[in-house]
Design a protein with these regions (language model features):
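Catalytic Walker B motif of ABC-type/P-loop ATPase nucleotide-binding domains
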Residues: 65-68
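Conserved ABC ATPase signature
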Residues: 40-44, 48
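A short, surface-exposed alpha-helical micro-motif characterized by mixed small hydrophobic
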Residues: 103-105
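Hydrophobic anchor residue at the start of the ABC signature
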Residues: 54
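Conserved beta-strand-loop-alpha-helix hinge in the C-terminal portion
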Residues: 117-140
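H-loop/switch region of ABC-family ATPase nucleotide-binding domains
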Residues: 97-98
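Conserved ABC ATPase "signature" region
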Residues: 7, 11-36
């Protein structure tokens, strides 16, 4: 994240100085950042910075979004809002997440990797967090 305002972080990444506020405003509203549009990113909380980074990813044109722990710095309510925004904006989303319940709730398919190999590749529907326990057992630190 650049240490500029939320607005500059969203607009400068892919279309410098040509982005109209109308393009960014729906993303800011969805991520509840409208009141921070001109705030320096350094003044934002960790969760607000993370939402700004998600906003940049949502603003980027394309059909695929890949994210590593996109909701790690926000509370559960905000995590759900962010995941709704992510999954509602891009047809293909690949997320690395450790929150098993949220992964099951928002994913169509779960792929678990253990020791560098695919240990799980199943539809998320009908799964429960305990079904994923084996992925976390005997992990080396």
């Amino acid at each position: 994240l650049h240490q500029r305002s939320v607005w500059r972080n969203l607009r400068n990444l892919f279309m410098p100085y040509k982005v109209d506020l109308e393009l960014v405003l729906p993303i800011l509203k969805n991520l509840r950042l409208v009141d921070k549009i001109h705030a320096s990113v350094g003044e934002l909380s960790g969760g607000q910075q993370q939402r700004t980074a998600v906003g940049r990813a949502l603003f980027h044109p394309g059909d695929i979004l890949i994210a590593d722990e996109p909701v790690s710095a926000v509370d559960e309510h905000q995590a759900r809002e962010i995941l709704k925004a992510i999954t509602g904006n891009k047809p293909t989303v690949v997320l690395a997440m450790h929150d098993r319940a949220l992964a099951i709730e928002f994913a169509d398919r779960l792929i678990g990797i253990k020791n560098g190999l695919i240990a799980l590749d199943e539809p998320a529907s009908g799964m429960k967090p305990s079904d994923l326990d084996d992925l976390y057992k005997n992990q080396s630190l």
